């Protein structure tokens, strides 16, 4: 069941991924949302799993977001243009690195395109971030995603992160 108005119920697109389709009423734009729920819960809310969502409009990626399902702490660094960011540690398969993701109203983080491209081709994806009850890790199993479907809907292909 989808939480968004005018969006069809999700269908499996391989592994633990779901795809939700809709049409924007005013513009007629085709919207596709891919969602991956984490394998675990955060301490603050044992009923809501953290999730990753990819939003695509008319065949292009518009936003990749990480929603932890808990209220985020204040931003801890400025971005390139001064927007507030939260630094997280990301693990994609056997590579890990720190990223500053844009902090969106204290509810979710906007991921960079490089991380999204690494995620869609990965078997292991983990995000460690500060929460109000200490550092926590969201663990995902992204393997099995139909990459042809993501390429059609978002013009996105996987890319392994560099180890340097």
Describe the role of every protein-language-model region:
Residues 1-164:
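A generic "folded-domain core" signal
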